[in-house]
Curated annotation (Swiss-Prot):
InterPro entries membership: Formyl_transferase-like_C_sf (IPR011034), MPG (IPR003180), MPG_sf (IPR036995)
Record's protein name: Putative 3-methyladenine DNA glycosylase
GO molecular function, one term: DNA binding
Enzyme class: hydrolase
Length: 206
């Protein structure tokens, strides 16, 4: 069986090294294992992106998960196989990108909340209409806009172009805390981030 490969674009940031491409098997595990292991990985879309510094886990038994009430046309990708992108619109304004995890039918996913921009900064600045790197991808809606991700990318595989997620090359120090912007199960400590990162959407409680 041939392993999935994706071209490694040159970096225009400070982190040129990329690990191997994550395959769908990586995402076929518990969402609680996958979420913290995504911290430090590099998410690229069409050659633009950066280091994942913040995520949130959503399990199918979780009242805050879109899949909690069962399958709908909106969330059907969550009920499919792992390793695919689940894209939805938040508050009718922003697109958000998630990675589907666990075996098919489990309907669990990890929301990518923030990136440290490292690749394709010129394209991301143009899409966002600003220059400050810390503001390009410091939130799920911001990063989707910066990368150019929309509903047209819902259901695409994460191990094939235009997506690529590269395994982290070091073991980062990770912090955890309550998720943001939800009212149900708001106390679950299922938000994970890179300790002391300047690119988080919001600092973690100390």
């Amino acid at each position: 069986m041939t392993k999935s490969r994706a071209p490694k674009p040159p970096s225009d940031g400070t982190h040129p090294a990329l690990g191997p491409l994550l395959t769908r098997w990586f995402f076929a595990r518990s969402v609680h294992e996958v979420a913290p292991e995504l911290i430090g990985a590099t998410l690229l879309f069409g050659g633009a992106g950066g280091i994942i510094v913040e995520v949130e886990a959503y399990h199918h038994t979780d009242p805050a998960a879109h899949s909690y009430g069962g399958p709908t046309p909106r969330n059907q990708v969550m009920f499919g196989p792992p390793g695919f992108a689940y894209v939805y619109r938040s508050y009718g304004i922003h697109w958000c990108v998630n990675v589907v995890c666990e075996p098919e039918g489990s309907a669990s996913a990890v929301l990518i909340r923030a990136l440290e921009p490292t690749h394709g900064l010129a394209a991301m600045r143009k899409r966002r209409g600003l220059d400050e790197p810390r503001s390009l991808c410091s939130g799920p809606g911001k990063l989707a806009q910066a990368l150019g991700i929309t509903i047209a990318d819902n259901g695409l595989p994460l191990d094939a172009a235009p997506f690529a997620i590269h395994r982290r090359t070091t073991t980062p120090e990770i912090v955890a805390g309550p998720r943001i912007g939800i009212t149900k199960a708001a106390d679950y400590p299922w938000r994970f981030g890179l300790k002391d990162s300047r690119f988080l959407s919001k600092p973690f409680p100390r």
